[in-house]
Amino acid sequence: MVIANKNIIFVAGLGGIGFDTSREIVKSGPKNLVILDRIENPAAIAELKALNPKVTVTFYPYDVTVSVAETTKLLKTIFDKLKTVDILINGAGILDDYQIERTIAVNFTGTVNTTTAIMSFWDKRKGGPGGIIANICSVTGFNAIYQVPVYSASKAAALSFTNSLAKLAPITGVTAYSINPGITVTPLVHKFNSWLDVEPRVAELLLEHPTQTRLQCAQNFVKAIEANQNGAIWKLDLGTLEAIEWTKHWDSHI
C-alpha cells in the first residue's frame, strides 16, 4: 500500500475534487495528511479528522503564487515536524480565462515552484531520500477546450513539466505522474469565463457533455496513487481510470 502509514502533503486539498480526494486518502490510512490551501475551512478539517481518527490531519495556509523561497520556508516547517514526507500532491487550479496571469501563476507556475521547493528536501544529489509527486493536470492538456485557451495551455504546460520530472527520476530520486480529470461536476465548471468572451455559454455547453462525479474522480485518483507508476499519464474520465500512451512526434535524443 502506497498511502498507508505515509506522510502526504496535499496542495489545494480542500477544493472541489481535492476535498473528495482528501476524504478517500484519509480512508486509506496515511500517518499524516498535511493540507495546504489558500482559505482555511475548519469544518472540512474536522470532517477529515472524524473520518479516520488514526490519521493526523493538519492545515497550513498557502498561496501557490508565492516565491520558491517562501514555499521552501513553509516546507521546512513541515519537514521539521514530520521528519519525512513521502508524497506531494499539487492540486491548485482555477478556470477563468479573464484572469490570464493568475491562471498561469496558479495552474502552472505554482506547480513548478512548489515542486522546485520540495526538491531541496528530496533530491538524492543533496542526500535526500527521494519522493513521489502527483500533479493534477487535465484532459485539456491532451486536447484543448479552445474557448478557454489560457486554461488549456496552462494544463498542457503542467503535463509537460510532469512528464519531464518522471524522466529526471534516475537523477533526482523523485518520481512523478499526472492526474488528468475529464469533465467533473465541481463548482469550477458551473460558471467560468471564456477568453475574450468568445463563447459566453461555454460552461453551459460543457455540462451538456457526459460528466463524472467528484467521488468517482477521487476514488480513481486514489487508485492511481496506489499504482505509483512513474511517468504515468492518468486519464480520469466518465468514472474510469486509464493510463494513456503519449504519441511521440519528436525526440531530442539527449
Swiss-Prot record:
Tell me a GO cellular component. cytoplasm
List the keywords (alphabetical).
NAD, Oxidoreductase
- The reply on keyword Nucleotide-binding is no
Q: Which domain of life is it from?
A: Eukaryota
Where are the catalytic residues? 151 (proton acceptor)
| E.C. no | 1.1.1.1
Q: Name one GO molecular function term.
A: alcohol dehydrogenase (NAD+) activity
Q: Which GO terms describe its biological process?
A: alcohol metabolic process
Question: Residues that bind NAD(+), according to the entry?
Answer: 10-33
Give yes or no: UniProt keyword Iron. Answer: no
Its UniProt entry gives the catalysed reaction(s) as: a primary alcohol + NAD(+) = an aldehyde + NADH + H(+); a secondary alcohol + NAD(+) = a ketone + NADH + H(+)
Record-listed substrate binding positions = 138
Assembly and oligomerization: Homodimer.
Q: Per the similarity annotation, which family is this? A: Belongs to the short-chain dehydrogenases/reductases (SDR) family.
Under what name is this protein listed? Alcohol dehydrogenase 2
Which organism's genome codes for this protein?
Drosophila wheeleri (Fruit fly)
* Phylogenetic placement of the source organism: Eukaryota, Metazoa, Ecdysozoa, Arthropoda, Hexapoda
